[in-house]
Regions:
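Non-heme Fe(II) oxygenase catalytic core, chiefly the N-lobe of the double-stranded beta-helix
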Residues: 1-145, 151-180
Length: 180
């Protein structure tokens, strides 16, 4: 859930992509090929737009940022950035039986597939998922609240000027619907 406590004068909208709808619109043959694939997700992959091959210093800085902003604690001295790598199914099934694609900027590679081929597949599926048929753009007004199903959605902010007053509060509801 996101709540707008302050909004930017220009920009700062949030785009949501429906990964359930993206999955459902794929051809049946492609769905059959994708079922059972697993994807490695990592913080390094999520930072790749800023540094294709990060230095050890950059990796350490990213890990520190995760600990400080998400966990509110110091990085343990024995922390390895690779500890922040997780494997998830490419196709996740909700307890209702509905399926969605598990994608995002952290999706790094497809397990058991050559690196370039797996990254090309991830890139193609991302492009498919964020097409207009599956997306919604929210133009924030102060006080707006948007509730979304995180395993069934991708979301991103559009550019806005720093210091614009944009302040968002995020609330995460936990439960049994984990992606594993």
């Amino acid at each position: 859930m996101l709540k707008a406590c302050g909004v930017a004068e220009r920009g700062g909208q949030t785009e949501f992509a429906n990964t359930y709808a993206a999955w459902e619109a794929l051809p049946e043959e492609e769905k059959a090929e994708l079922e059972g694939l697993r994807v490695r997700h990592s913080i390094v992959a999520s930072m790749r737009p800023f540094a294709e091959i990060p230095t050890e210093e950059e990796r350490a800085r990213w890990i520190k940022a995760v600990f400080n902003t998400r966990l509110g604690e110091e990085v343990p001295p024995d922390c390895d950035p690779d500890d922040f790598e997780k494997e998830h199914p490419l196709v996740w099934t909700h307890q209702s039986g509905r399926k969605s694609l598990v994608l995002g900027v952290s999706a790094d590679r497809v397990v058991g597939m050559p690196l370039a081929e797996g990254r090309a597949l991830i890139s193609r599926l991302m492009e498919w998922t964020v097409q207009p048929d599956f997306t919604y753009r929210h133009d924030w007004k102060e006080g707006d609240i948007v509730l979304f199903d995180n395993p069934g959605a991708l979301h991103r902010v559009l550019p806005y000027r720093g210091g614009s007053g944009r302040v968002m509060h995020r609330t995460t509801v936990s439960g049994v619907e984990l992606i594993a």
